[in-house]
């Protein structure tokens, strides 16, 4: 019997918040059993298939990102879909903390996370926090795409 099945939104949010609660940095070991062996994950940086590749990605993220914080702003679950609106706060050596705002869409199959798509504006959110770069970047984006 596999006890690692998500039953409701509160259970998922509790597991997700624990990732970023450790003083040593992000830890994924407690939530990985809730992911499907055939997990499909995609974000602005990468596309991953399978639990081995996903586990390797979480290990890389944990090694690189010791100073991560996460705030959940809103969430909902309808059927087998979970949506989470979040803010990830990253600390850099030379620059002030940066916030990346995003949304995750999680699809469950038999209580396991089968599909996760994270949507965020990686470059815009980071560049907004680099003083000498932010104004020029935003001016360029507005002129070309606004």
Please describe what each predicted stretch is.
Residues 1-33, 143-146:
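Short, low-complexity N-terminal intrinsically disordered segments enriched in polar/charged residues
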Residues 4-8, 50, 137:
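Residue-level preference for long, well-ordered alpha-helices that form the structural scaffold
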Residues 16, 35, 58, 86-88:
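Hydrophobic alpha-helical core bundles mediating ligand binding, dimerization, or RNAP-core interactions
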Residues 63-69, 76-146:
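A beta-strand edge to alpha-helix "cap/lid" segment located at domain peripheries
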Residues 27-80:
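A solvent-exposed, acidic/Ser-Thr-rich amphipathic alpha-helical stretch
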């Amino acid at each position: 019997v596999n006890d690692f099945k998500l039953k409701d939104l509160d259970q998922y949010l509790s597991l997700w918040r624990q990732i970023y609660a450790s003083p040593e940095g992000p830890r994924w070991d407690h939530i990985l059993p809730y992911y499907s062996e055939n997990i499909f994950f995609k974000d602005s940086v990468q596309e991953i298939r399978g639990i081995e590749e996903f586990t390797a990605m979480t290990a890389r993220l944990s090694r690189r990102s010791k100073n991560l914080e996460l705030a959940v702003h809103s969430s909902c679950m309808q059927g087998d879909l979970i949506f989470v609106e979040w803010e990830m706060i990253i600390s850099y050596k030379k620059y002030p903390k940066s916030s990346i705002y995003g949304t995750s869409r999680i699809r469950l199959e038999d209580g396991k996370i089968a599909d996760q798509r994270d949507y965020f504006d990686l470059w815009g959110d980071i560049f907004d926090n680099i003083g000498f770069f932010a104004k020029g970047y935003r001016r360029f984006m507005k002129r070309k795409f606004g």
